[in-house]
Amino acid sequence: MAFELQDTKVSPIENKMSLMEKLEILSDAAKYDVSCSSSGVGRKGDGTGIGNTLKAGICHSFGADGRCISLLKILFTNECIYDCKYCINRRSNDVPRASFTPDEICELTIQFYRRNYIEGLFLSSGILQSPDYTMELICEAVYKLRTLHRFQGYIHVKAIPGAAPELVQRLGLLADRMSVNLELPTAEGLKNLAPNKHRKNILTPMRQIQQGITQNKNELTVYRHAPSFVPAGQSTQMIVGATPESDYQIMTVAENLYRKFELKRVYYSAFVSVNEDKDLPVLPGGPPLLREHRLYQADWLLRFYGFEAQELLSREKPNFNVLLDPKADWALRH
């Protein structure tokens, strides 16, 4: 798991603000990322460091014992070289910008943990200079947390599409869970609203993580002390309502992700209008939260009841009944 830390050139903006000013900006900027619920890792602390993934339950809702589990949820930076039309942090937006240093990420995580505010870290990021540069900084932060600070709590990190495979591998040996945001359900929607991003660059690290997890499971059967690779699995997130896809299309995409990439979770984020753009929908009623809720209910049927998307919806009936949950709707039709 060890690797050589590489020198990083800190962006000048990082030296212009206090740590608390950065925290205020970068915690607020992270609120639109919903994929921070987490589970499935059973690694215990060994008594020589701090943190314990098993004891915490590791989720941002409720643990098996009913306790609410807290993760420090922040962006490494809200600087971004991309100009995604739906994102508050798009390059062309005039918003306060900030970036942490790796040491500041460590300081915040350890101080928040020692004060019993959190039991883990959820770290996402905009793209500072390049995908590789950003991933190098994230790797350095997580490496220092694990080694210098002996932090053994839960860490969920967003992988940066387009970053070098060796950086994805490096981060996978440090994090409990990784995720790569699908962003939008279809490649066409991505091309229209996020012209700097490409579907292939998203699916490539997703496939690498899947293959790494499978290989690691085989290694652990032979040598139980082999370093773990993303032991809590991977997840993804897609925005719902920013593009015209039907619920049937969205559930079909989710079903394929579960089957082909063995994801632990697909998260659905109701589109929140934060920018004015001719290509973005106008939602007089606000974010489609009830639609998001129905998708989560249907997702549960896919993951735990073995349903297929075509059993719940079809081309003739492409959207869920907002007045009836998908399971009840299916029962009434059968």
Question: Across the structure, where does each feature detected by a protein language model lie?
Answer:
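Canonical Radical SAM [4Fe-4S] cluster-binding loop centered on the CxxxCxxC motif
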Residues: I74-D103
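Short Fe-S-cluster ligation motifs
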Residues: L108-S124, A298
